[in-house]
Amino acid sequence: MEKNCGSGQSKLKALRMHMYFEVDFQEQAQHYQAVLHSRGVTVDLQPIEKLNARFLRLNPDLALCVDENGLWLSANGMKMQPDWKAEIPRLKRASLKSEMIARACQLGEKPVLVDATAGLGHDSLLMAYLGAQIQLVERHPILFTLLEDSKAQAQHDPFLSQFMDRIQLIFADSASYLQQLDQEEKTVDVVYLDPMFPQRDQNQQAIKKQAQVKKQMQLLHLLLPEDGEMDLGDHLLELAKKVAKRVIVKRPRHAIFLANQEPAHQWQGDACRFDAYFQ
């Protein structure tokens, strides 16, 4: 079940996007247009003859497109969607023992977990597969709709459908959602934070990493610029600590601590680490 907390777009400027589609997919495009309109996004439908790599190269501006695989974000000759089905090989290799994130979040105890920095949902997908009950919170209407579409497709996949009921999508601002939990005196087992944009001036290692981000993340950075719709997550740490016994923060291995707060415990990997804060 998806939940709308009414605050998803409260801090976002008005959005307007082109949506490209071949005529065979007009009905689907109109559906996405209506959904996005209900979330404050004006979508201009643009039927085209052929949605292919050449068209994307000739139309480099940030836009949406629709084909047989659903809704995509496109720019600079590339297109992106969360594509949860592509994560299946990774999931099949994963276990509670092999995954550092499983140890950090104590997934063996099947926790109720709020992922307050959704991104493409890949970490939440893994955590749900390993047993967690996930509340996946995203405030950007376009990214939320992409996640919603990926979940809808996953529900028709024989493998992914087995645990889709463990992922609840919540259209809300994460800070507002955590504040609401606190005001209602509700708690969860874990809050998971994976801020997408470490502070560049204090984290030169992260700068080098960001130069190598894969195509999905390049497009996500265009949709969620650091000085616009995407924040750095620092303010979420204190809010998270009020509602969870355990807060786990994923960071590049050499990044500074989130909000400059030293964690109680760390799990170190080759490329990233998990910082733990306990209540």
Curated annotation (Swiss-Prot):
Transmembrane segments: none annotated. Pfam families: SAM_MT. Its main location: cytoplasm. CDD domains: AdoMet_MTases. The keyword Ligase does not apply. Its EC number is 2.1.1.242. SUPFAM superfamilies: S-adenosyl-L-methionine-dependent methyltransferases. This is Ribosomal RNA small subunit methyltransferase J. It comes from Acinetobacter baumannii (strain AYE). Specifically methylates the guanosine in position 1516 of 16S rRNA. Belongs to the methyltransferase superfamily. RsmJ family. Keywords: Cytoplasm, Methyltransferase, rRNA processing, S-adenosyl-L-methionine, Transferase. It is found in: Cytoplasm. PANTHER family: RIBOSOMAL RNA SMALL SUBUNIT METHYLTRANSFERASE J. S-adenosyl-L-methionine binds at E138, R139, D194. It catalyses: guanosine(1516) in 16S rRNA + S-adenosyl-L-methionine = N(2)-methylguanosine(1516) in 16S rRNA + S-adenosyl-L-homocysteine + H(+). GO terms for molecular function: rRNA (guanine-N2-)-methyltransferase activity. It is an enzyme of class 2 (transferase). It comes from the Bacteria.
